[in-house]
Amino acid sequence: MEMLPTFWAPAECDLLTGTTLAPALTAKLNSLNREFEQLREATSSLPWCAEQWWDEVDGILEFDDWLQVDAFYRSRALEYPGVGDCMVPCIDMANHSSGTGTAAIYEVDDQGNAVLLLRDGKTVEENGEITITYGDKKGACEMLFSYGFIEDEMESARELFLDLSIPGDDPLGRAKAAVANCAPGFKIVESGDGVSWDGAYIWLICVNEEDGLSFQIQQTVEGNRELIATWKDEPVHGFEDFRSILEQDPLWDVYHLRAVSVLQERIASQLQDLYGSDDQVDAAQHGDGTNIRERAWHLAKRLRFLESELLEKAYSYYEDEVSWRRGPLSEDLHSFRPDHGVH
């Protein structure tokens, strides 16, 4: 577990600058700090906890212990069909191998017991290793974040998540942020020769009052006040499916092109951050006698390469799409700035 990024030294974390793992790691560490303080507050009034855990001199519980608890669970929990996340003795110690290298699968039998089944056509020699898959479709960032490694056979980052923010000069910005019930960003997924994307949040950035989006304060039957979003006078019940509403609009092609323009600008911004820190990462002293372990440096370099490849592919792919869709729609886009929401 020592290679999980939550255990990396500050100098090692700096190697992740420009990758999608950097903000995810910062958010995770902040979350773990809050959880640890909540644990302290909830238990410090218990005499034995105050003495054994939190005593300033003899207390044995430290933040690193909470990191260990998180790592045990995050790197070993498996999602069992119909049950959810579980830690199963022995099975949770099996190593990962994807594709044809996966020797066994984990299932739940008729009695609700966790079982490990050899895959059809597979054999395991005596004293051989039984491997499972942690998820063949998981991206490089998630694999490094959750398990502390990237498969040698992985040739693509597979997917990545880029955050977005509603621009500060958006007149409806505060209202949009208040009603948004979706992740603030979008996911890019490699799909054959192309790249697909998904993210409801981007549509909040792409439309405004002049398009038909508005907000009103409404009183509920309980007497409370709540903010209600409407699209062309029709209520919007959550923005996860807002795209399907926009697709029915005569100006759908305009909204779609706006979204792709925002997406492309955000990808360009991420590439700039990634390439802008390359020299610093390359020059970082690593190995024995330094603050950067050899393995951490190589993992960071590998992630940077894989994510840059996918970002470059996505930028080129959507540049072609923007050029193809622009033209007759350029006049409609004139007043829309695609750098909105881009960091």
Indicate where each model-derived feature is located.
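Short, conserved secondary-structure segments in the cores of folded domains
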Residues: 117-120
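Charged low-complexity "KEKE/polyampholyte" interaction tracts
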Residues: 138-343
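Short, charged beta-turn/beta-strand-edge "cap" motif at the junction between a beta-strand
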Residues: 122, 132-140
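Residue-level marker of positions within ordered structural domains that often coincide
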Residues: 99, 132-135, 312
